[in-house]
Amino acid sequence: MLLSKYFLPVLKEDPSEAQITSHKLMLRSGMIRQQAAGIYSWLPLGLKVLKNIENIVRSNMDKAGCLEVLMPCIQPAHLWVESGRFDNYGKEMLKFQDRHDNTLLFGPTNEDMVTDIFRNNIKSYKDLPKNLYHIQWKFRDEIRPRFGVMRGREFLMKDAYSFDIDEESAVKTYNQMYKAYINTFRDLGVFAVPVIADNGPIGGKLSHEFHIIAETGESNIYYDKRFKTLKDNPDIDIEEIKSWYAAAEEKHDASKLSSDKEITSSKGIEVGHIFYIGTKYSVNMNALINDEHGKLTPIEMSSYGIGISRLVAAIIEANSDAKGIIWPIAVAPFKISLINLNIHDSKCLELAERVYNELLAQNIEVLYDDTDVRAGSKFATHDLIGSPYQIIIGPKKAANNIVELKNRKNGEIEDIDLNKRALNSYLTFFNS
């Protein structure tokens, strides 16, 4: 992509309405623009990140055996009345009447609707287990939306719902999804810790929250240091992982810890929540299944959520510095920023075009800065938008077929002599 053709409305200063790092940087880097309180348009750069995260989440749900569906964001209120949850969300749930005086709502979650789909289509234990998921926009009319997409009114969620014949099978599915979440956050390139949590208005018997560790987090998390090994050792047994200590501050009890436990504490941002619900919805909504003895029994359900739009902000909170965003490679909108410092220099132009075409041939997402602005402005822009790597082409080194490869995270710069080695031999980090 040529920067001269791209839509990237960057801001030089922090917007006055932004309080936290991610909100400031998402506005400054041209990722989003506010349309109303807590409601945002996603511009090209932001949408690329959102889609990258969505695709990684989708891939891990598919690997876990989940089946993708798409439920509407507008739901009939009678399902929520039937489940007994219609009044639970209060004014946060946006309700309205259609022209036929039917009460509808903009769904904040989908347990009620997915239970309705299940009960009308699956009747036998032979069709179990089932695990359905969708990725859809939600709306909650927060009284004080703030912090950009971190706590907006409209947000993108992945919700999965599993259906099992009995508690043993339900717990097995829950554990599979717990592991799938660990794999998901590893693939996103972030460090997330699962902690025991309350079920809240969703209801149920068992629950875990997943928190990205970030200095600017809103929750205090206490956890076993062994969680830090998950990124490099994803095959650890699920029961071993669940035996490691992890708790949010309200559930932390130091007196119950043995002296040999290595516990650390950090700030965390909740980005995922999984629930073993049990039969709450199946009983209320008459979602029954014929078991192997022909007896009607309420289905065992679990629910699994990941805040995809919230993840964008949380990743920035955990991966940024004074200059801007530092994207993990997996979610970066562009893996490389190609910066031509002098578009009027024939050698710079020739080398930039050559490198650009080589990167495209390798299917590496690259933003080629072909604009006619001063070098300092270019560096500021590309540090702000956070491409993990920058290839910098300036007249002095270009004359000798040398370009610079800069690591955005640590600032290290390496000369690439294109007379001696092919460009792709320097880009092995894309295959690691």
Curated annotation (Swiss-Prot):
SUPFAM superfamilies with a match to the protein in the record: Class II aaRS ABD-related, Class II aaRS and biotin synthetases
EC number: 6.1.1.15
The protein, known as: Proline--tRNA ligase
Organism: Rickettsia bellii (strain OSU 85-389)
InterPro entries for this protein: aa-tRNA-synt_IIb, aa-tRNA-synth_II, aa-tRNA-synth_II/BPL/LPL, Anticodon-bd, Anticodon-bd_dom_sf, Pro-tRNA-ligase_IIa, Pro-tRNA-synth_IIa_bac-type, Pro-tRNA_synthetase
Keywords: Aminoacyl-tRNA synthetase, ATP-binding, Cytoplasm, Ligase, Nucleotide-binding, Protein biosynthesis
PROSITE patterns (UniProt xref): AA_TRNA_LIGASE_II
A GO molecular-function annotation: ATP binding
Reactions catalysed: tRNA(Pro) + L-proline + ATP = L-prolyl-tRNA(Pro) + AMP + diphosphate
Xref: CDD domains: ProRS_anticodon_short, ProRS_core_prok
Subcellular location: Cytoplasm
Lyase found in the keyword field: no
Alphabetical GO biological process terms: prolyl-tRNA aminoacylation
Similarity annotation: Belongs to the class-II aminoacyl-tRNA synthetase family. ProS type 2 subfamily.
Summary of the function given for this chain in its UniProt record: Catalyzes the attachment of proline to tRNA(Pro) in a two-step reaction: proline is first activated by ATP to form Pro-AMP and then transferred to the acceptor end of tRNA(Pro).
HAMAP family: Pro_tRNA_synth_type2 (MF_01570)
Cellular component GO terms held in the UniProt record: cytosol
Pfam families: HGTP_anticodon, tRNA-synt_2b
Encoding gene (name): proS
Chief localization: cytoplasm
Oligomer and partners: Homodimer.
